Amino acid sequence: MSLSDSPSKSGNTGKDLISNNEAKNHEDEETHQKKRRRRTTDAEATLLEQYFLKTPKPSLIERQELSKKLKSSMTPRELQIWFQNKRQSLRRSNCLSRNRLEGTGENSLLRRKSTLTLCETSTGQAELFFQSWPLHSQSVVGEMIHHEQDDYNKENKQQKVVDTTKDISRGSNGNEDSAAHQELEECARSLVELQQQCNDH
């Protein structure tokens, strides 16, 4: 005689045990299903916002008290998730605000267009002009320099202009910025020397 053929001591057969297990599994599935999401009311949101300003990371006891104030509309676990989401949202908005103020992303560099102009004055001395603009205004800068040079050429026919343009990466590190300026100064010195050599010949 096999086990499946013999009745159990409780009087259940094998078929009864299977149906009991199925019923138990069905109950477990219902309890493990996710709760439907519900939106907080305006009153709840106001209370939670005020509480968040005082205590952005409440303890379990504080969340339980807050749950009682909300008349159990939110469990302490739901409150914990709400506060986590609120802190993350605040961090994200602070990061976006900071990036907007800097004008660039966190890891990108601010690109600038620098123009070095060497002009000979009416007395024969060389003058050096240095200007720097953001890259997005390059075309405006080029037109402005062109118009300024045309106006200056009309007034002083003997003007000789040498334009040197260079892209400079300027990051948050001051060493990069000073190195770029040193490089431009060296370039300017060599341009002045070149201009003086041309005048001597």
Curated annotation (Swiss-Prot):
What are the Basic and acidic residues biased-composition ranges? 23-32
From the UniProt annotation, which stretches of this protein bind DNA?
Answer: 33-92
Ranges in coiled-coil conformation: none
Regions of biased composition (Polar residues) lie at 1-22
Report any one BP term from Gene Ontology: cell differentiation
**What triggers or suppresses the expression of this protein?**
Expression is induced during S phase and depends on the MBF transcription factor complex.
Task: Write the protein's name.
Answer: MBF complex negative regulatory component yox1
Give the source lineage, highest ranks first.
Answer: Eukaryota, Fungi, Dikarya, Ascomycota, Taphrinomycotina
